[in-house]
């Protein structure tokens, strides 16, 4: 595995975007399936992508999913989907039919089941599991990723792509992981 080190979050975002675009350029007939998480680094990346790479990105060959979501409406500033919608998707005119949000206002257990079904129906499967081309994760200061916090490692062995992760941070910050 290769490792890359960049001098800033901005440089990292540029490098990642350029890598993703190059990956898509190598297979011009392929549809690519992406799963994104939230947080400060993806927000920076979304803003840069919309403002500096809009014209060179093959948006119509991308299908957008989420790794996790908070149980809040899309309009809430803490919504991962809402953040990406405002910073990137609306800016580049991404058609709704290529965007598959987790609905944070639904009951977490029901939405985790519904989203698992949706992902398994719309993303190519490998060994019975969704085979995304890219899953972009971050890591919180407390060591969490994909809404899986220390002590919740049991979620990694779920038979479903998405499960509910109740956190210790805030009562509304709950759903889901890939």
Give the location of each predicted region.
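Ligand-binding beta-strand-loop-alpha-helix segment within the catalytic cores
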Residues: 59-136
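Short, well-ordered amphipathic alpha-helices
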Residues: 20-21, 44-53, 85-86, 116-120
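A short secondary-structure junction signal
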Residues: 112-113, 145-151
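Glycine-rich beta-strand-to-loop/alpha-helix junction loops that act as flexible
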Residues: 36-41, 137-141
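Conserved small/polar residues in nucleotide/adenosyl-binding loops
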Residues: 167-174
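A glycine- and small-aliphatic-rich helix-loop capping segment at beta-alpha/alpha-beta transitions
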Residues: 48-58, 82, 86, 150-159
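Short glycine/serine/threonine-rich phosphate/pyrophosphate-binding segments
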Residues: 43-45, 144-147
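N-terminal glycine-/serine-/threonine-rich phosphate-binding loop
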Residues: 1-33
């Amino acid at each position: 595995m290769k490792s890359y080190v960049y001098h800033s979050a901005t440089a990292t975002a540029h490098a990642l975007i350029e890598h993703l675009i190059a990956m898509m350029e190598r297979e011009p007939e392929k549809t690519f399936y992406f799963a994104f998480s939230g947080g400060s680094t993806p927000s920076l990346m979304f803003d840069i992508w919309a403002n500096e790479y809009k014209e060179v990105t093959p948006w119509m060959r991308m299908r957008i999913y989420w790794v996790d979501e908070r149980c809040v409406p899309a309009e809430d500033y803490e919504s991962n989907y809402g953040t990406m919608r405002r910073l990137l998707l609306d800016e580049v005119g991404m058609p709704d039919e290529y965007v598959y949000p987790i609905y944070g206002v639904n009951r977490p257990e029901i939405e985790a089941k519904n989203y698992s079904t949706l992902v398994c129906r719309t993303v190519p499967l490998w060994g019975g599991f969704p085979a995304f081309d890219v899953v972009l994760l971050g890591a919180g200061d407390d060591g969490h990723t994909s809404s899986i916090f220390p002590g919740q490692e049991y979620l990694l062995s779920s038979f479903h792509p998405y499960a509910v992760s109740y956190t210790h941070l805030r009562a509304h910050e709950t759903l889901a992981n890939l």
